[in-house]
Amino acid sequence: MPKLLGSFISFKSPHYLVGSVRDAVSIKAQAFMIFLGAPHTALRVDPNRMQIDEGHTLMEQHNLSKSGMVVHAPYIINCASKDPVKQTFAIDVLTREVKLCHAVGAKLIVLHPGSAVEQTQTQALDHLIKVLNTVIANTKEVIICLETMAGKGNEIGRDLDQLKYVINHIEQQERIGVCLDTCHFHDSGNDFNNTAEIMETIDTKLGFEFLKVIHLNESKNVCGSKKDRHANLGEGMIGFDNLMRFIAQPQIKQIPIVLETPSDKHNYPAVYGAEIERIRAWFGAR
């Protein structure tokens, strides 16, 4: 059984962290992932308004560990941009976001690696490395987790070789890791029908010591499609049993596993509660 299983959780006014913890508790989650503001903007409220201490107290009351709390960086930044102005913006936003993570008690922040606009993939990776080393040098403790991407358009991070290249050039490697998104990994060409092959790929190309978070998602598309369209568990092309066999692996079930499957205002957070219950039922039957 996964130790830290949960989902994306809303973080919003007026209750912020307290509201997030309440939602996580309501679906019996052991982990949760939040945006510290709207995903497509850099605007953030003062941390004094985020009800952090009250949220931590509520977490303790419900045995929710801070090791299961994950933050997602805003989508608005492209840390791989060659534009000096956009690089500076990315550094400023990500630095502030990492400091906010530290303030709310999260040790992990997930980041989309960026896009290779008007440059080669390698050039984009080098720009990402520069941004990450700068941000890490100006912050503390929080681990930046580069998310595996599906490979659509000019995205970088479409394979583990690229992410390991970045890791190899980070000056403080204890501050860098990877978030493996199962939908993205499938869409970029990794077949979850073969669990052993998936695990070998992670082991040889990355190393499990750098795998810090799992985004557990189904995919609406075939393997290798490079589409990035999430589906709910049991409704996609990866296969529920394949996903369960993957997260049952000893190297996987000890890290935060977070659902990012589709939800809306009518079924949030209940849809995640139902999926968590289904996952636990699968493990309970074995």
UniProtKB/Swiss-Prot annotation:
Zn(2+) 2 binds at E147, D181, H215, E260. Zn(2+) 3 binds at H184, D228, H230. Coiled coil: none annotated. GO terms for biological process: base-excision repair. PROSITE patterns: AP_NUCLEASE_F2_1, AP_NUCLEASE_F2_2, AP_NUCLEASE_F2_3, AP_NUCLEASE_F2_4. Its EC number is 3.1.21.2. GO terms for molecular function: deoxyribonuclease IV (phage-T4-induced) activity; DNA binding; DNA-(apurinic or apyrimidinic site) endonuclease activity; phosphoric diester hydrolase activity; zinc ion binding. Keywords: DNA damage, DNA repair, Endonuclease, Hydrolase, Metal-binding, Nuclease, Zinc. It catalyses: Endonucleolytic cleavage to 5'-phosphooligonucleotide end-products. SMART domains: AP2Ec. It holds the Pfam family AP_endonuc_2. Zn(2+) 1 binds at H72, H112, E147. It comes from the Bacteria. Its cofactor is Zn(2+). Binds 3 Zn(2+) ions. Endonuclease IV plays a role in DNA repair. It cleaves phosphodiester bonds at apurinic or apyrimidinic (AP) sites, generating a 3'-hydroxyl group and a 5'-terminal sugar phosphate. Belongs to the AP endonuclease 2 family. This is Probable endonuclease 4.
